Structures are given as C-alpha cells and as structure tokens.
Amino acid sequence: MDIIPPRLKEPAYRIYEMRLRHELVRSKAQLPRHIAVLCDGNRRWARDAGYDDVSIGYRKGAAKIAEMLRWCQAAGIEMATIYLLSTENLQRDPDELTALIEIITDVVEEICAPYNKWSVRTVGDLELLGDEPARRLREAVESTTTKGANFHVNVAVAYGGRQEIVDAVRSLLSKELANGATAEQLIEAVTVDGISENLYTSGQPDPDLVIRTSGEQRLSGFLLWQSAYSEMWFTEAYWPAFRRVDFLRALRDYTARHRRFGK
C-alpha cells in the first residue's frame, strides 16, 4: 500500500536522492568503473499505462537512456554498456521490430551527438538489422572519438552472449591459422586470455555492476563471459520508470558488497 500522498512523492524522492548522494560521498567507497544495464520492461510499462501501441514504451525507454548515461558520468563512472536488442528480440512481430529498430537507431544517434563528447562502440551483429539501420549506426559510432573522451559507451544491439563467445573463438582460430598454426598449436591457443582478446569488448574492463530493471532476475545472455564476477542488482521498476533514486540505490548497494572474485 502506498502511504505517501501523491503531492508529497516528488519532494520525498528529491530528499531521498540527496541523502543517497551524501551517503556515497561520505562513504568514500570505490564506485564501479564499468556499469552494464539491461533496459527491460518497456512493453510492460506501456501496457500497464494503458497503451495498446507498445512502441510508446520503447520511445519512453529510449528517452531514459541518455539521461541514465549522464547519471553515470556525473558519478565518475568511466564506462557503461546498455543492452537494447538481443538476437532473440529479432523474432518479434515484424511491425513491432521495425519500430523498435528505428527507435534504437535514433537513440544511438543521440548518444553519438558531438555535444556529449562520448566514445561509443556497438557490440553485436549489425548486419542482422538490415542495410539502412546498420549504415546509420556505423556512421553515428564512427563520428565519435576516443581522443579526449572521459566516458565510454557500449551499445549492445543484435547481441547474443553465446554468439559473442563463438565469434571470439572463431576469430582467435582464424588468426592462428593465418599464421600457419598446426592443429596442436590451435588447441594451445584457445585460452581464457585468447578468447577475451577477441570478444566484441576487447580491450575494455569487465563490468563491475550489472543492473536489470523490470523484476526479472537473469542475464538473458548479456555479457556472459565478461560478467563472470560482476555484482548483480535487480529492481522491480520497468526501464521507462527507472529513476535516479534507483540508480543511486544500486551504487550504494554495490559499495556495501565485498567482491571476492571467486577467492
């Protein structure tokens, strides 16, 4: 039961948000360097809000992405990976999928805008989206630069965690074959480091914290290799309703954990 009167909710959340920020500052705890987010629950948000057109939920969720990235940047986080479209999502209704891909393309172009000064990389198989969306996404990402960027963004589109590992192994073996490796040398080349160096996220730190909205408590194939020792944080909030208060709670919970990395 909601005990806070509607007219007092916004002021109450602002006070709570301020308190969380002060807690993080006072704790002097180490914040995550890299946050990964599964932006889930757009369709359910739209249906619960009474909309028949689920693309309204996608649009609402898209508007939240740049906002959340600015929260990360303001907190001093160096990198964020956002999961926007899985390979499984490509099986959705064609009309819904067309609208979703257009929305994703628009939001990536927004993220890549010069005024953000962010370095952006896509992870996934853009060819699965069709020629025009793939072209627009490549052009947008290529317009960003790592030079002078103090915040880096990965956008997971047409991404599958299992496929990424398969692609990494294939890439590793192809390079070894090109160098004339024997069968025995190929077997020896398949190592943890060798696979890591051929992932879509090669050269980047693994995520310290993985956030998933919508109440679902699973990775759904997201960064399977990279998230081996990531901390997980789940919230019931649908992505369009995800607030800065929720984000700060995730950071607070992260700083209270002791990361053992399997030791």
Curated annotation (Swiss-Prot):
What EC number is given for this enzyme? 2.5.1.68
Residues given in the record as Mg(2+) binding sites: D40, E231
The UniProt catalytic activity note for this protein reads: isopentenyl diphosphate + (2E)-geranyl diphosphate = (2Z,6E)-farnesyl diphosphate + diphosphate
Subcellular location(s) of the protein: Cell membrane
**Its GO biological process terms?**
polyprenol biosynthetic process
Please name the catalytic residues of this protein. D40, N89 (proton acceptor)
Broad class of the protein's primary localization = membrane
What does the entry list as the binding residues for substrate? G41, N42, R43, R44, W45, S86, T87, E88, R92, R212, R218, L219, S220
GO molecular function terms attached to this record: ditrans,polycis-polyprenyl diphosphate synthase [(2E,6E)-farnesyl diphosphate specific] activity; magnesium ion binding; Z-farnesyl diphosphate synthase activity
Q: Name one GO cellular component term.
A: plasma membrane
Family in the record: Belongs to the UPP synthase family. Z-FPP synthase subfamily.
For this protein, the record's HAMAP family field holds:
ISPT (MF_01139)
> What is the protein's given name?
(2Z,6E)-farnesyl diphosphate synthase
Organism lineage string: Bacteria, Bacillati, Actinomycetota, Actinomycetes, Mycobacteriales
